[in-house]
């Protein structure tokens, strides 16, 4: 009895999983026009009552199932050994809990390895950051023809109890050496250059030239020492003058310009001379209106009277 009830329950479950879909078949469907000659539709009866209604029929699928298809064969559990077992564990850092809605990472542990060992292999060493002390030095340079005053004072953000000393560096030492720090109070160093002397840098400072001075202050400003003789001269556009001078300096270009001018002058003189010649010939020429008559068999005879027309 119990076995029969089990079979009935399995049959009902199988029928519920496969819903019966009604199959709709159109009976009154006109055949397809293969030759394409039929222009009128065949859906009308021709009696004037309108289109014929379509007749639809539904076919329900059969509900009989073979019983022998639903037999279930029990299977024995597969033997498992302790060596081939795999443990699935979720690895989370200490003090953290998985939130709702977030996927949990499952790590498959192999024999002889743990999830912690894999984490150690993945993690990289943190980069070491070294903070270097940066001291800013503010300086003002005044360029004059007579004297130059250089004032160096400590920055407002420097530590109290320290003072800054400036000393010329050697040629082999870099330009941006840190200032020497000594104990004691703050002090201000002022240097005044005598009249008539130029503002020169010690050997090794700057960019290697004596005309430019590069200060290593916080703003990275560059101050150029201007010579007194070149201060009042207007700026010269080197791009415009350089192109014209380069063309005129070449002998081939200069010779071509001179030759072209001479040829043009000769051609103009010849044209004017030809025009004057034509005008002069028209003024001097004379043309007779009647031809002289020849007598005595065509012998030459001086005409007695001849009318002349002056053009």
Curated annotation (Swiss-Prot):
Modification after translation: Shedding is enhanced by a number of factors such as heparanase, thrombin or EGF. Also by stress and wound healing. PMA-mediated shedding is inhibited by TIMP3.
Single GO biological process annotation from the record: positive regulation of exosomal secretion
SMART domains linked: 4.1m
Top-rank taxon, per record: Eukaryota
Gene Ontology CC annotations of this record: cell surface; external side of plasma membrane; extracellular region; Golgi lumen; plasma membrane
Subcellular location: Membrane; Secreted; Secreted, Extracellular exosome
Modified residues (Phosphoserine): 286
Positions of glycan attachment: 37, 43, 45, 47, 207, 217
Signal peptide range: 1-22
Single Gene Ontology MF annotation: identical protein binding
Site feature: Cleavage: 243-244
Cytoplasmic side, ranges: 277-311
Extracellular side stretches: 23-255
Bilayer-crossing regions: 256-276
Sequence segments annotated as region (Disordered): 29-59, 152-184, 285-311
Ranges of compositional bias, category Acidic residues: 32-42
Function: Cell surface proteoglycan that contains both heparan sulfate and chondroitin sulfate and that links the cytoskeleton to the interstitial matrix. Regulates exosome biogenesis in concert with SDCBP and PDCD6IP. Able to induce its own expression in dental mesenchymal cells and also in the neighboring dental epithelial cells via an MSX1-mediated pathway.
Family: Belongs to the syndecan proteoglycan family.
Oligomeric and partner information: Interacts with CDCP1. Interacts (via C-terminus) with TIAM1 (via PDZ domain). Interacts with MDK.
Annotated protein name in UniProt: Syndecan-1
Protein's organism: Mus musculus
Taxonomy of the source species: Eukaryota, Metazoa, Chordata, Craniata, Vertebrata
Gene, per the UniProt record: Sdc1
């Amino acid at each position: 009895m119990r076995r029969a009830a089990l079979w009935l329950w399995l049959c009902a479950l199988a029928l519920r999983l496969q819903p019966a879909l009604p199959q709709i078949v159109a009976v009154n469907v006109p055949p397809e026009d293969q030759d394409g000659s039929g222009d009128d539709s065949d859906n009308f009866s021709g009696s004037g009552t309108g289109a014929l209604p379509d007749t639809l029929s539904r076919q329900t699928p059969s509900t009989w199932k073979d019983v022998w298809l639903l037999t279930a064969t029990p299977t024995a559990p597969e033997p498992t050994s302790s060596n081939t077992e795999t443990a699935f564990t979720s690895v989370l850092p200490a003090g953290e809990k998985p939130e709702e809605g977030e996927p949990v990472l499952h790590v498959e542990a192999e024999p002889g390895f743990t999830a912690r060992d894999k984490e150690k292999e993945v993690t990289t060493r943190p980069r070491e950051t070294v903070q270097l002390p940066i001291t800013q030095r503010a300086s003002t340079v005044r360029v004059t023809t007579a004297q130059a005053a250089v004032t160096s004072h400590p920055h407002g953000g420097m530590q109290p109890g320290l003072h800054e000393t400036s000393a010329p560096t050697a040629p082999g030492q870099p330009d941006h050496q840190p200032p020497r720090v000594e104990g004691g109070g703050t002090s201000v160093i002022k240097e005044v250059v005598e009249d008539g002397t130029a503002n020169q840098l010690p050997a090794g400072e700057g960019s290697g030239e004596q005309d430019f001075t590069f200060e290593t202050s916080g703003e990275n400003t560059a101050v150029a020492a201007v010579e007194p003789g070149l201060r009042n001269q207007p700026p010269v556009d080197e791009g415009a003058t350089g192109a014209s001078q380069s063309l005129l300096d070449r002998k081939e270009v200069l010779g071509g310009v001179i030759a072209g001018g001479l040829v043009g002058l000769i051609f103009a003189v010849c044209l004017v001379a030809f025009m004057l010649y034509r005008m002069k010939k028209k003024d001097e020429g004379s043309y007779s209106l009647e031809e002289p008559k020849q007598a005595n068999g065509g012998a030459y005879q001086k005409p007695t009277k001849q009318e002349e027309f002056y053009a």
